[in-house]
Amino acid sequence: VPVLRCVELATGKARWSVDDFGDCMMLLSGDRLLALMETGELVLGRVTPAGWREISRAQIVGSGARSQPALANGRLFVRDRDQLVCLDVP
């Protein structure tokens, strides 16, 4: 089962981890992590060296989402097998 893990670059030591995070494609913007789950659910969270805090989640596309989300000019582009979705990201 996929694990979300923060690793200290200089030492390779794990700082924290989240078990059973799930299969996803991730995008980091500042301290916000956007994770498009394989189920089509979008998870927004904050990441710091101290840990992960989930902010929200929403089903935005169908299952089978395997493409990398793209963020440009305050818009998030996400696709699944059948559609392309554009969301405003504040």
Predicted regions and their residues:
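Noncatalytic, solvent-exposed loop/strand surfaces
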Residues: 1-90
